[in-house]
Amino acid sequence: MSPRAIAASIAAVAWLACALAFAAPPIPQSLAAQEWTAIRKVIDDQREALKAGDGAKAMTYAAPGIREQFGTPDNFMRMVREGYGALLTARRTQFLEGAVIEDAVVQPLRLVLADDTVLVALYQMQKQPNGQWRIAGCLIAPSTVQST
């Protein structure tokens, strides 16, 4: 990513961290490789459930606050279709390097759409008391990187 793209991503992550108020245990400033693998699996599994139209399963990958906010699988799927359609329709995806910024764990996912538009989905992750990672929020931002 270019320095400008990194700065834009950091600004978006800062906005996301401020916008999402949740109680979570402190996170170390770096995570082990197996933690990033677990995080990416949660994101992949939720996207598969979303693409299959399985709102109930997709909600299981969301943090408790997100599940409470949307209440039902139908409401959750409606929100995804209306605001996060790129997650469902991207023709290609690529995980970028994740980051821990203060207590926010952020996993970027590059999305390439059918028209070669490139977006970045910034997932904020939350580790649950049982040790599992859940999605606490997602912000989709334009990318300055072109499709290859």
Segment roles from a protein language model:
Residues E97-T148:
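Exposed beta-sheet edge and beta->alpha loop/turn motif
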Residues M1-V13:
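Bacterial N-terminal signal peptides that target proteins for export
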